[in-house]
Amino acid sequence: MIGVFGAGIVGTKVVETLVVDLQTEILVHDPNKTTANRLASRLGEKHRVVSVARKSDLNAASIVVLAGPPPHATIAREFIEKNISVVSVSDDVSDCTNLLALDSLAKNHGVTLVVGAASSPGMSGLLARSMSKSFDAVDEVHIALHGTGGPACARQHHRALSGQSVGWHEGEWIR
């Protein structure tokens, strides 16, 4: 069983992707019950594995995808302490830092914690890493994305543009 916390544009895309490839039950929780109900009823007609859940119902999942706006660290800690693996799509620098600090907790509980599983960080880093193998050396990588996930993603993008960025350079994080 997989839980998805957040039924906005990003959470919807996560659920739509999961129902195509998996036949496991998917529990959808969103603080806005109307949003969760809309997603479950739209996908539930074709894929009977999608249902609306209370937050506490997600405790029955083996993995929870945190697809709502940040912060995710507190919610992730709750699930990890219940031996539930977590995938976070947060791209907020302080939230990602707090999530990464949960690594030893996740290991101690025998679960997986995936941080930054969105476009950037996430896919952009995986693509850069994969493509860098084709070159002798890579000095810089610039990523351009088209579109946005939704209103919460747009707000986070604007906050990110007005602040400091974090980069990985020669084996260490720099600001």
Q: Language-model segments: which ranges?
A:
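N-terminal Rossmann-fold NAD(P) dinucleotide-binding loop
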Residues: G11-T12
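Rossmann-fold NAD(P) dinucleotide-binding segment
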Residues: P71-V89
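Aromatic pocket-lining residues of Rossmann-like dinucleotide-binding sites
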Residues: L18-V19, F79
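Active-site-lining helix/loop region of Rossmann-like oxidoreductase modules
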Residues: F5, K133-R175
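N-terminal Rossmann-like NAD(P) cofactor-binding module of classical short-chain dehydrogenase/reductase
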Residues: S62-G68, V86-V87
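Rossmann-fold NAD(P)-binding glycine/threonine-rich loop
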Residues: S90-L113
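NAD(P)-binding Rossmann-fold cofactor-contacting core
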Residues: T24-A40
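Short acidic low-complexity segments
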Residues: R48-N59
